[in-house]
UniProtKB/Swiss-Prot annotation:
The active site is at D11, D130. This is Imidazole glycerol phosphate synthase subunit HisF. Its EC number is 4.3.2.10. GO terms for biological process: L-histidine biosynthetic process. It is an enzyme of class 4 (lyase). Pathway: Amino-acid biosynthesis; L-histidine biosynthesis; L-histidine from 5-phospho-alpha-D-ribose 1-diphosphate: step 5/9. The keyword tRNA-binding does not apply. Gene3D superfamilies: Aldolase class I (3.20.20.70). GO terms for cellular component: cytoplasm. InterPro entries: Aldolase_TIM, His_biosynth, HisF, IGPS_HisA/HisF, RibuloseP-bd_barrel.
Length: 257
């Protein structure tokens, strides 16, 4: 069985790591490189960096820090933010990233997924999906341009349809960002994860809602996700990654230690 992955997520804006709640009201956490180094040292399996306003600003990810991160960590890392072309992706890989993640640009141009997968291999292409649960209708909708709350918009894609579509086009992994849970720290949305898991044949990463160690356990054991991504519990040192892995191992979850 493949080991489950623990993945700290670093949202980047103006060259600094920030964190919001439900994708709003972002506060500054600190500098990118020291945080990345700390997480690698603590035992993270992978890091994900989102340049959160790149797509809504109509630009590509700020590459100045990608190379600096590659110099200080020896674990895989993934970079996202406004990647719209093969050339954009090529630059990020050249600076040392192991994977790229696309989200809003894939919604604008779904064929981008296939072009990137054909060029770099499916294993290097992650699709991020920002889902919002609409309580009145009981439906899960895919949102776009979520890095800037004034420009966030709901698309016409329902979640499960988009999950199927991106796999068809060559997504090698899916990160499901559950916006209702984001930064609230009351647990991942297991109902949503199970629905997605049923139609998702590629690695699935849960994102949004981790507040306690048991939340990671539940995502792995109950929803059978491949990785769990979290931000505020790591940034605010509520959970130590090494201790989390010891706890998960005791609970019967296969983790790298």
């Amino acid at each position: 069985m493949l080991a489950k992955r623990i993945i700290p997520c670093l949202d980047v804006r103006n060259g600094q790591v920030v964190k919001g709640v439900q994708f709003r009201n972002h506060e500054i956490i600190g500098d990118i490189v020291p945080l990345a180094a700390r997480y690698a040292e603590e035992g993270a399996d992978e890091l994900v960096f989102y340049d959160i306003t790149a797509s809504s600003d109509g630009r590509t990810v700020d590459k100045s820090w990608v190379e600096r991160v590659a110099e200080v960590i020896d674990i895989p890392f993934c970079v996202a933010g406004g990647i719209k072309t093969i050339a954009d992706a090529e630059q990020i890989f050249t600076f040392g990233a192991d994977k790229i993640s696309i989200n809003s640009p894939a919604l604008a141009d779904p064929d981008l997924i296939s072009r990137l997968a054909d060029r770099f291999g499916v294993q290097a292409i992650v699709v991020g999906i920002d889902s919002w649960f609409e309580q009145e209708t009981g439906k899960y909708w895919v949102n776009q341009y979520t890095g800037d709350e004034s420009r966030t918009r709901q698309t016409n894609w329902q979640l499960l349809d988009w999950v199927k579509e991106v796999q068809k086009r060559g997504a090698g992994e899916i990160v499901l960002n559950m916006m209702n849970q984001d930064g609230v720290r009351n647990g991942y949305d297991l109902t949503q994860l199970k629905l997605v898991r049923d139609v998702c044949k590629v690695p699935l990463i849960a994102s949004g809602g981790a507040g306690e160690m048991v939340h990671f356990r539940d995502a792995f054991i109950e929803a059978n996700v491949d990785g769990a991504l979290a931000a505020s519990v790591f940034h605010k040192q509520i959970i130590n990654i090494g201790e989390l892995k010891e706890y998960l191992a005791r609970e019967g979850v296969e983790v790298r230690r």
